[in-house]
Amino acid sequence: MPGWFKKAWYGLASLLSFSSFILIIVALVVPHWLSGKILCQTGVDLVNATDRELVKFIGDIYYGLFRGCKVRQCGLGGRQSQFTIFPHLVKELNAGLHVMILLLLFLALALALVSMGFAILNMIQVPYRAVSGPGGICLWNVLAGGVVALAIASFVAAVKFHDLTERIANFQEKLFQFVVVEEQYEESFWICVASASAHAANLVVVAISQIPLPEIKTKIEEATVTAEDILY
């Protein structure tokens, strides 16, 4: 059986892995990966708008991996519309990259549960195989954190190099052309970053759990026999 010191740290490692699992689920469900400002370029060109009038043509957009919302401002007031990524919008995006992001996050969910299971196993007993011990916990956390980091990097690539926001903003727009003037990563994106950070923190936790505690030795007093004791 592991000592109380290791049990405490392995328990913390299992909680961190479980928190990563929950964070990824939240990031998948909440449609707030990125928000931005979109300019109705067609409206600006039609009225030859000045700099002061541009604010009348700037709308808002936010989206996640499955759905989002857009507010069109084309000089006639804001018009809000909801949209879903699947099944039609994804065809206008880099579909392979978008699906890869989802698959990576689903894989990260499984790896987070595996790393949690290994931490619980080490908390209950001392595994007889090295791969099931602290090294195994580190391995699964490296894999889980790496997969989440790869999903984050893929999303950033889709935004920066594949004009993700602009493609979404112009989906099913036949009369108006929208241009992205501002982009900002939102809470779901940073939740994913926190998930990867939880696995990185687990590596530190496992390393701390291997620090040997100093043994507390009790000093045994030796019995002294005097001449008076012998006489008695």
UniProtKB/Swiss-Prot annotation:
It comes from the Eukaryota. The keyword Metal-binding does not apply. The keyword Isomerase does not apply. GO terms for cellular component: stereocilium bundle; stereocilium membrane. Keywords: Cell membrane, Cell projection, Deafness, Disease variant, Glycoprotein, Hearing, Membrane, Non-syndromic deafness, Transmembrane, Transmembrane helix. It is found in: Cell projection, Stereocilium membrane. Its main location: membrane. It is a multi-pass membrane protein. The chain crosses the membrane at residues 10-30, 101-121, 139-159, 188-208. Belongs to the clarin family. InterPro entries: Clarin. It is linked to Deafness, autosomal recessive, 117: A form of non-syndromic deafness characterized by prelingual, moderate-to-profound sensorineural hearing loss. Sensorineural hearing loss results from damage to the neural receptors of the inner ear, the nerve pathways to the brain, or the area of the brain that receives sound information. It comes from Homo sapiens. Glycans are attached at residue 48. Signal peptide: none annotated. One of its GO terms (biological process) is stereocilium maintenance. This is Clarin-2. Plays a key role to hearing function. Required for normal organization and maintenance of the stereocilia bundle and for mechano-electrical transduction.
